[in-house]
Amino acid sequence: QIYDTSCKGVYDRGLFSDLEHVCDDCYNLYRNSYVASACRSNCYSNVVFRQCMEELLLMDEFDKYARAVQIV
């Protein structure tokens, strides 16, 4: 896994892994490369990441992921 240089916070492999899984699962759902790159844009702080969470039924864990995005 390559470190995203758009992320300016703390490098935490576990948090990156959690965020990356959302984007990977979303890509697997849609099989669209735009979804994969847009999900990761701006260090996961974007509307596509949130839409992916909704589509993957992860909104009950939104606060956990929002904190992770703020940290990384």
Curated annotation (Swiss-Prot):
InterPro entries: Crust_neurhormone_CS (IPR018251), Crust_neurohorm (IPR031098), Crust_neurohorm_sf (IPR035957), Hyperglycemic (IPR001166), Hyperglycemic1 (IPR000346). It is found in: Secreted. GO terms for cellular component: extracellular region. The modification Pyrrolidone carboxylic acid is found at Q1. The keyword Secreted applies. It comes from the Eukaryota. Disulfide bonds join C7-C43, C23-C39, C26-C52. Its main location: secreted. Signal peptide: none annotated. Hormone found in the sinus gland of isopods and decapods which controls the blood sugar level. Has a secretagogue action over the amylase released from the midgut gland. May act as a stress hormone and may be involved in the control of molting and reproduction. PANTHER family: ION TRANSPORT PEPTIDE, ISOFORM C (PTHR35981:SF2). This is Crustacean hyperglycemic hormone.
